[in-house]
């Protein structure tokens, strides 16, 4: 994954100027907020060029492409299954909508991974990545060459989707409490947990399909309580 970065990391840290760290961090912020096709294309070219200059290899980019491909395959499967079980039919228009949503998520995730790789290569001490090393020790994995890349991927995914998950959690937990407060039996607790998980997944998929909804401030409506 990040093996080509590890090979040159020690030499890079000694000669990387502060402007490289600032530039890599600025690229990371730009990748988080890129929305247009032109911005995506220009950032992709810049990141590919910088990755080739810094690492003399594109192995890490190939690893990022594999990760994004696996995630998009999982994303499309969930979207199609959700559409089929909701409406019973999967039309060409719905498939095109899923492809459009998958493009935006996939390209932003790819840019985010590439930018985080460069930021990691140009930065010597960072609390985020020291936390990743601690995670590896907790998992009892001796080789940090395997632990750190996996932890970084998990961190980037959490940062990418963490805001939506946290917002939905704070809203839907009141629904979960309302359903369990009426009856404290084990069956009712399991039913409320499954309903909460299903509603959370549905709302996250809806936000992924409509990027404009990510900035909206939603409130849980009362009809969710009486949906079943």
UniProtKB/Swiss-Prot annotation:
UniProt keyword annotations, A-Z: Cell membrane, Membrane, Transmembrane, Transmembrane helix
Topology with respect to the bilayer: Multi-pass membrane protein
Any Pfam family: CbiQ
Residues that span the membrane, as ranges: 37-54, 67-89, 104-126, 138-160
Cellular component terms (Gene Ontology): plasma membrane
Secretion signal, residue range per the UniProt entry: none
Compartment(s): Cell membrane
Major location category of this protein: membrane
Protein name: Uncharacterized protein TP_0226
Organismal lineage: Bacteria, Pseudomonadati, Spirochaetota, Spirochaetia, Spirochaetales
């Amino acid at each position: 994954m990040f093996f080509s970065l590890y090979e040159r990391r020690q030499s890079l840290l000694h000669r990387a100027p502060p402007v490289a760290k600032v530039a890599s961090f600025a690229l990371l912020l730009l990748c988080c907020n890129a929305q247009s096709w032109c911005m995506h294309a220009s950032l992709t070219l810049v990141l590919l060029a910088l990755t080739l200059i810094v690492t003399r290899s594109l192995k890490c980019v190939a690893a990022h492409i594999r990760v994004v491909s696996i995630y998009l395959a999982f994303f499309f499967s969930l979207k199609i299954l959700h559409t089929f079980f909701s409406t019973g039919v999967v039309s060409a228009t719905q498939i095109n909508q899923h492809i459009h949503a998958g493009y935006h998520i996939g390209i932003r995730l790819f840019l985010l991974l590439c930018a985080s790789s460069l930021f990691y290569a140009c930065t010597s001490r960072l609390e985020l990545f020291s936390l990743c090393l601690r995670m590896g020790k907790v998992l009892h994995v001796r080789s940090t060459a395997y632990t750190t890349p996996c932890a970084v991927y998990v961190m980037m995914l959490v940062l990418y989707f963490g805001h939506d998950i946290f917002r939905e959690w704070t809203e839907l937990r009141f629904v979960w409490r309302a359903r369990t407060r009426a009856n404290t039996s084990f069956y009712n607790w399991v039913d409320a947990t499954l309903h909460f998980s299903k509603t959370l997944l549905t709302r996250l998929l809806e936000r992924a399909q409509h990027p404009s909804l990510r900035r909206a401030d939603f409130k849980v409506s009362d009809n969710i309580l009486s949906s079943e």
